[in-house]
Design a protein with these regions (language model features):
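Internal maturation/activation junctions in enzymes
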Residues: 49-75, 79, 98-155
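Flexible, active-site-adjacent loop/turn segments at secondary-structure boundaries
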Residues: 27-32, 82-84, 100, 148, ...
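Short, contiguous, pocket-lining structural segments
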Residues: 46, 83-87, 118
Length: 170
């Protein structure tokens, strides 16, 4: 409803957001490991807190980036959108661990269960943060703090950070 065109590049495929000459897309991403899904799925604070963590990282980026020349467009975007993205890793490992065939009805049901939980808790945390800490200008009236809350998890960079190994097969 704001008539903002989404643009893409070969740099970021995890999520898409608006950008222009005054704003450079910037987001903060993390993943939850589905290998341990059964251990954290009933914790009502786990996903909620992960999104709060990501918003706090965006805030630190804004505060520190505001003092660095050359980051003006990215900081402006971060302030206005507070774009975060929580993704998942190791879905296929979870399926293997639980003897669920990939592509089976059971795997589709598990996929729906997982991502419904992520969406519900991510939206809930963004609404809570908007109420407690305020909505960014672009989201005034929506009751949300973050323009994006979920994202595809970056795999290659995560693997490098993990030291070149990964619980997931991808």
């Amino acid at each position: 409803d704001k008539k903002m065109e989404l643009k893409s590049s070969n740099i970021c495929i995890e999520t898409s957001e608006y950008s222009d000459y005054e704003k450079t897309f910037a987001c903060c991403l993390s993943s939850v490991n589905l290998y341990y899904f059964d251990e954290w799925k009933d914790d009502p604070d786990f996903i909620f807190d992960m999104n709060i963590l990501l918003d706090c990282v965006i805030e630190e980026y804004i505060q520190k980036g505001s003092k660095l020349p050359g980051l003006e467009c990215a900081v402006r975007f971060a302030k206005e959108h507070r774009s975060i993205g929580l993704g998942v890793t190791a879905f296929q490992t979870y399926l293997q661990k639980n003897n669920i065939a990939f592509g089976s009805i059971e795997s589709y049901q598990k996929n729906h269960e997982i991502f419904s939980l992520l969406k519900e808790q991510s939206d809930k945390s963004s609404r809570w943060m908007a109420e407690k800490w305020g909505e960014p200008e672009i989201l005034k009236g929506y009751g949300l703090r973050n323009t994006t809350r979920l994202a595809q998890a970056p795999k290659k960079s995560t693997t490098f950070i993990d030291g070149g190994t990964h619980l997931a097969l991808s």
